[in-house]
Swiss-Prot record:
CDD domains membership: WD40
GO biological process, one term: outer dynein arm assembly
A GO cellular component entry from the record: ciliary basal body
Compartments, record wording: Cytoplasm, Cytoskeleton, Flagellum basal body; Cytoplasm, Cytoskeleton, Flagellum axoneme
Protein name listed in UniProt: Dynein assembly factor with WD repeat domains 1
PANTHER family: PRE-MRNA PROCESSING FACTOR 4, WD40 REPEAT PROTEIN
Residues in coiled coil: none
Role played: Required for axonemal dynein assembly and ciliary motility in ciliated organs, including Kupffer's vesicle, during embryogenesis. Facilitates the onset of robust cilia motility during development.
UniProt keyword annotations, A-Z: Cell projection, Cilium, Cytoplasm, Cytoskeleton, Flagellum, Repeat, WD repeat
Length: 415
């Protein structure tokens, strides 16, 4: 084994080793999820060298410099205010979802008008209209980090795969017997998972365009699904009050997470795949040990349905959004509520962190989106201007651009 080079990963902090083994180029990641501006760097370097034979004494200084760079990035204070850059009269009918590519150079909007549109973020110009679905385009995603493909899931029961560069349709995946409402690419960008109102999830092979697996076992609609960071697990959240954990590529169901007393609205893995967070209409969020499928915490406090849940990029914070008009931030390790985000005058349907983990963005039926400090719960900015409910919002990876999608048929770019 021979170390070729180091690559830095800012969020979540880590160093990627590129090395040669038996003539093949391979990579492995050293996660530094606990790194903070006050961490003793020499100690971290020492621990890395003990654990990683590829990093020899001659590389010590280099590794130290990399960690100092990560530390500097984490410590950067962000007092940015966002301003409205463009209003895109995106579709003739309401939007369903918005999503960025990894670099944030382009984003996509899905709509009830049966299309998905690709936009250039810098100019606000429309690049492509992806046409071909025969009903609402509901679930949309880029194959990040690559960003060269787009998947669309529709109420017409099909999923389509498109070229992000040309807008050409590569495949139409047929097999579901009801609406597709959620989808995800695996991290390797070799599979697409789709979740449907027909109670099943399906996996599709991107290369061949064939169905690879059907995951059956839920007793009601699948409303949420996501892969873990390595792509060997998939979770599906259902209206049957449960979440299933599936082994990929075998399709074996490893665990059924039972305990919620209402429909699941969202289910997510944390970065190191040790925890699963689930949000439910029973007003609670639960944390589960992903290895044994046991519930390790029930995060309470909301007075109405929990509509969304998300981890920050390191997996140390959990944020929930509720129909009670508040959001909450919990510590994943202590399970305590760290901050209550109060100020919206309507339900919050969407919540997300920026990649840096120092900002939270919420979308609400009160026609505003808000920016928050996750540690103090302080509202830093209210993004006003939409004339109807905002149900989708996203940060780009750099954290310097925001998109919001509303029932007013427009999409707004803020930066």
């Amino acid at each position: 084994m021979r170390l070729k080079r180091f690559l830095l990963r800012y969020f979540p902090p880590g160093i990627i080793l590129e090395y040669e083994k038996g003539g093949e180029l391979k990579t492995k990641a050293i996660d530094l999820l606990e790194l903070s501006p006050t961490t003793d760097v020499d100690l971290v370097v020492e621990e890395i060298q003990k654990a990683e034979p590829l990093i020899t004494a001659s590389r010590t200084q280099q590794v130290k410099q990399l960690i100092l760079r990560l530390q500097e990035k984490i410590g950067q204070q962000d007092s940015r205010q966002f301003y409205l850059f463009k209003v895109l009269r995106a579709h003739i009918l309401p939007l369903t979802n918005v999503a960025f590519n990894k670099s944030g150079s382009s984003f996509i909007t899905g709509s009830y008008d049966r299309t998905c549109k690709v936009w250039d973020t810098a100019s606000g110009e429309e690049l492509h209209t992806l046409e071909g679905h025969r009903n609402v385009v509901y679930a949309i995603q880029f194959n990040n980090p690559y960003g060269d493909k787009i998947a669309t899931g529709s109420f017409d029961k099909t999923c389509k795969l498109w070229s992000a560069e040309t807008g050409k349709c590569y495949h139409t995946f047929r097999g579901h017997t009801a609406e597709i409402v959620c989808l995800a690419f695996n991290p390797q960008s070799t599979l697409i998972a789709t979740g449907s109102m027909d109670t099943t999830a399906k996996l599709w092979d991107i290369q061949s365009g064939e169905e690879a697996l059907t995951l059956s076992g839920h007793a009601a609609e699948i409303i949420s699904l996501s892969f873990n960071t390595t792509g060997d697990r998939l979770i599906t959240g259902s209206f049957d009050h449960t979440v299933s954990v599936w082994e990929i590529p075998s399709g074996r169901r490893i665990h059924t997470l039972i305990g919620h007393r209402g429909e699941i609205s969202s289910a997510q893995f944390n970065w190191d795949c040790s925890l699963i967070a689930t949000a439910s209409m029973d007003k609670s969020c639960k944390l589960w040990d992903s290895l044994n499928g046991k519930c390790v915490a029930t995060l309470t406090g909301h007075e109405d349905e929990v509509l969304d849940v998300t981890f920050d990029s390191t997996g140390q914070l959990v944020a929930t959004a509720s129909a009670d008009g508040t959001a909450r931030v919990y510590s994943a390790s202590s399970r305590k509520c760290l901050a209550k985000l109060e100020g919206h005058e309507g339900e919050i349907s969407k919540i997300c962190f920026n990649a840096q983990g120092n900002r939270i963005l919420t979308a609400s039926s009160d026609k505003t989106s808000r920016l928050w400090n996750p540690h103090t719960g302080e509202c830093l900015q209210v993004l006003k201007g939409h004339t109807d409910e905002i149900f989708s919002c996203a940060f780009n990876y750099e954290g310097n651009t925001i998109i919001t999608g509303s029932k007013d048929n427009t999409c707004r770019i803020w930066r």
